[in-house]
């Protein structure tokens, strides 16, 4: 290698080493402390659905063993409703995990550190289900135009708390903080519903109640119960017609299940249906009963001979066994006989009995 090339390589190596030493010297300097900048608090990851409008700060209100829940309506009747359906409901959700007594008291809020739930006749713009929540370090106040709005508000309160609040056992080492905020909310849609098919897969009364609880937590207000189809008839109909006991809708039509996990078939008595309706009403949810017809009617047709004009009183079957209920997943193979006057008499009787136990307008 020539002397010129050796010189150039040494010069390049020296420059590279100098640059490296300069870089390491700079990066090795002590890091200067920088004050962290707290981002504005947000509720977007906590609340479903997100309120129409809200402002939140970094401050907190903490529920403690001294916290009480005060409820006050515009009159005694409304106060009683708030006490049972809203105040005691909220307390029942908070007591197991906090271990606090959380007494529910009728009247004006006294002192600090409490939760107040009040109805105001000056908040008519909130409608039936709207609400406001004002939270400061000294307490939380729910204001609504109607008890339904106050009930929707406490679902927001539940979501504002740490997730452990939903546990049904005592949780230790958690500070039950709620971010200080102003929340103004009302539903965008009047009808916020869910559909539950209890025909193809029968759910017990307790199962339906749990489903209603889940709906309530997300401020839904309509439960559409699918009570009849080819695979089953799920509501008791009393009496007899044309010499046949309508209880056959239970003893035959309800003894089906398309479930693959061993769930038994079943039917709701009218008393059980009223129990479901009342449970939902306490959570400001309307039960909408639905009977599929004139199609999807195999469970009724195979149960009651008078609905069929055939010689043996059995439905036109096609490829299906018309001597027993159907437990498959096919659809579109059955229909009431629209030229049979007995069909309309049966439908009238079903609707008459359902109307007596269902307050729904549908």
Predicted regions and their residues:
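N-terminal secretory signal peptides that target proteins for export/translocation
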Residues: 1-8
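Sec-dependent N-terminal signal peptides
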Residues: 9-22
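Acidic, contiguous N-terminal accessory segments
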Residues: 18, 35-187
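Sec-dependent signal peptide cleavage junction
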Residues: 22-39
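Feature activates predominantly on carbohydrate-active enzymes
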Residues: 124-344, 350-362
């Amino acid at each position: 290698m020539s002397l010129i090339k050796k010189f150039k390589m040494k010069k390049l190596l020296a420059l590279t080493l100098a640059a490296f030493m300069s870089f390491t010297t700079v990066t090795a300097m002590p890091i200067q402390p920088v004050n962290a900048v707290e981002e504005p608090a947000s509720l977007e990851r906590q609340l479903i659905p997100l309120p129409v409008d809200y402002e939140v700060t970094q401050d907190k209100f903490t529920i403690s063993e001294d916290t009480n829940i005060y409820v006050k309506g515009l009159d005694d009747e409304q106060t009683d409703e708030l006490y049972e359906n809203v105040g005691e409901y909220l307390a029942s959700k908070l007591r197991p995990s906090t271990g606090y007594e959380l007494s529910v008291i009728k009247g004006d809020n006294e002192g600090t550190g409490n939760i107040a739930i009040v109805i105001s006749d000056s908040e008519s713009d909130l409608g039936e289900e709207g609400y406001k929540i004002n939270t400061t370090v000294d307490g939380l106040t729910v204001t609504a135009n109607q008890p339904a709005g106050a009930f929707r508000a406490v679902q927001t309160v539940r979501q504002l708390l740490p997730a452990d609040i939903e546990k049904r056992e005592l949780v230790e080492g958690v500070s039950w903080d709620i971010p200080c905020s102003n929340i103004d909310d009302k539903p965008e849609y009047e009808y916020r519903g869910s559909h539950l098919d209890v025909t193809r897969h029968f759910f017990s009364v307790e199962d339906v109640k749990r489903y209603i609880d889940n709906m309530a937590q997300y401020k839904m207000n309509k439960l559409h119960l699918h009570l009849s189809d080819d695979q089953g008839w799920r509501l008791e109909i009393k009496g007899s017609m044309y010499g046949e006991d309508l209880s056959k809708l239970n003893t035959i039509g309800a003894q089906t299940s398309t479930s693959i996990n061993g769930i038994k078939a079943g039917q709701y008595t009218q008393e059980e249906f009223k129990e479901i309706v009342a449970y939902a009403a306490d959570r400001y949810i309307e039960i909408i009963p639905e009977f599929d017809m004139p199609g999807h009617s195999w469970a009724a047709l195979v149960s009651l001979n008078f609905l069929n004009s055939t010689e043996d009183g059995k439905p036109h079957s096609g490829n299906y066994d018309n001597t027993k209920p159907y437990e498959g997943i096919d659809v579109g193979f059955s229909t009431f006989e629209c030229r049979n006057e007995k069909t309309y008499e049966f439908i009238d009787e079903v609707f008459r009995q359902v109307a007596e136990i269902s307050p729904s307008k549908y």
